[in-house]
Amino acid sequence: MSRSLSECIDQGRGLVPADLVLKHGRVFDLVTGELVQTDVAICGDRIVGTFGTYTGRREIDCRGRILVPGFIDTHLHVESSLVTPFEFDRCVTPRGITTAICDPHEIANVCGLEGIRYFLEASAHLVMDLRVQLSSCVPSTHMETAGAALEAKDLAPLLDHPRVIGLAEFMNFPGVLMKDPGCMAKLEAFRGRHIDGHAPLLRGKDLNGYIAAGIRTEHEATTADEALEKLRKGMRVLIREGSVSKDLHALVSILTERHAPYLCLCTDDRNPLDIAEHGHIDHMIRTAIRLGAPPLAVYRAASLSAAEAFGLKDRGLIAPGRRADIAVLDSLEGCHAALVLAGGVVADDAAFSARSGVEPVARASVKVAEIAPEAFRCPGNRAETPVIGILPGKIITEHLTAEIEPVDGDKRPDPARDLARIAVIERHGKTGGRATGFVQGFGMARGAIASTVCHDHHNLAVVGIDYADMALAANRLRALEGGFAVAAGGEILAELALPVGGLMSLRPFEEVRDALVTLREAARSLGVTLEEPFLQLAFLALPVIPHLKITDRGMVDVDRFEILP
């Protein structure tokens, strides 16, 4: 919907009617902090006129409303919404999110470049502007079996794609510090481009070395002190509020007008239930203001600062020449969008219906032989046993130890001590490997839950008390082409098929949301106390997040960066 320069100039000068005029609203100026009554004239996908009165071929009365720049989610994995990019677009764009910067490393870990190309192709057909960061860590480390491996030479052909910003979160920070050849090759290939970071708890001179590798932004700060150190060292900090990783409350104290130019907002991993019940970036804005952050600082972080951090110079302000990404709100505090424009297009049912689709990829990706209950035994001779300790609302875990006496060579789950079996089974048809261990924090008293969403290798993960139920849930996911399942007493209590790479549903967003409600209720019937049991489970297998994790190759001591014997 672009227009010629001549048309933009004439419409901006008011010589001819604008394509669209938003009348009588108040614009929140993110430079001065003023609320200014003005019309906003739009030519094609560009804002061409503000601070004046305009006539348009189409006019929308925004009397009593506040106009703000569209919001930018600076780091997310669309796959965590459990729907395709098209349903994600329909789900969040009407909330004011007009730009999202995604790292498709979930689907890339399943099917490699095919998954990244799927996102790039889909991004050209959406109402929102979906930008792609090329996945840097596929797999995330050498201690897991993923469905693909991407090296610098694989990513290089996509470097100049118009929808690619740069290199996505560099999770293997130990590899950077140890100058691993594969890591160094990627850093060199993207030198001078935007490189996103991922360095939880990294401080001091090690953080200096990591930043010196050319890494500009980072979203893993969980305390104000950690975030301030990263700000002082020149990083842009992305404040995160996902479905599991909830850092906004801990970081809201730094969200001030002084710091806002160097802060952004992101969701990282947010599921449809949270989006439906609470919101997305709009939820973060409401929450931050409610917690006392100045509205000017919050809205800057949500748009202008985000645009500047990622080199998107054509957006972030309601000003002539900028992309017509606008959210029309009831109030700054409420942040409920009555109307959203994305590139000058009204984000409504007609716009979503007009999109052309893209054929999904990575079907039939669960390549696992039938699993027997005996596969979930945990052999051992010593009573002293490492246990993954869950911290609710965090993806960081504790490295605990428990005394578990083996019975007939098997260390068995003990619900009385909240010690459940956890297993990860390779599902990409490569090694057939599996590992078993213990996790504490689910509160599970019976049954099992299973998932093929298992960061970042996305193998088949199962947590349970009863081996037969664990096998039942795992085998059900083989039949569904991946997804979630809850089993107890020899029956499947709830399920959700995720046939696109074992990660995304082909069903509408609303149906996925309803299925998640049923799954959550079924998990609670097993005694599970976690608010987000499936997302919490997914992160227990990510060996770049301290302190103890599990992959298909064994229990991983993340601090020592090694598999436990």
From Swiss-Prot:
It is an enzyme of class 3 (hydrolase). The keyword Cell cycle does not apply. GO terms for molecular function: adenine deaminase activity. GO terms for biological process: adenine catabolic process. Keywords: Hydrolase, Manganese. InterPro entries: Adenine_deam (IPR006679), Adenine_deam_C (IPR026912), Amidohydro-rel (IPR006680), Metal-dep_hydrolase_composite (IPR011059), Metal_Hydrolase (IPR032466). Its cofactor is Mn(2+). It comes from the Bacteria. Its EC number is 3.5.4.2. It catalyses: adenine + H2O + H(+) = hypoxanthine + NH4(+). Belongs to the metallo-dependent hydrolases superfamily. Adenine deaminase family. This is Adenine deaminase. It comes from Cereibacter sphaeroides (strain KD131 / KCTC 12085) (Rhodobacter sphaeroides).
